Amino acid sequence: MNFKIKKLNRLAISIVSFAAMSAINYTIIHNPIVLLSCFILLIHELGHYIMAKHYKANAQFPIFIPLIIASVGITQVFDLEDQYKSNVALAGPLLASCFIICLMLFNFLYKLFSTKFLLLFLTSEILLNYIGLDGKKYRKFKQNNLSVSFS
């Protein structure tokens, strides 16, 4: 019961923050660029959440405050082995990149020119996570395999 209340509280925080931001700037809810960016950020965080749940880490329902912060509460991720930490760290950018690539293919097929450059920008923004800017990660090569670890 307590777990469901925590989930609802986190969801309520996310909804209230999105409503507050749309009240501050009315065009935020009608701007497809902002909505697409928020949706891709949500998919990014859900990638971390799903992978952490897969490895049975204590991941909590994500708090999502659009355009300011999004976080997944994972308290046991540091107890995992390096291989599993790497997978949890890479799951968010990989899932978001796959989603963006699918949107780009859809746009190129249906010739929606208005969002092509936005999707290219978002792809490059998500791919920046692989070079160590997300969560103080660094790369190291170990036995000819790339693994991402927390510093």
Region roles according to the model:
Residues 1-151:
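Hydrophobic transmembrane alpha-helices and their immediate loop junctions
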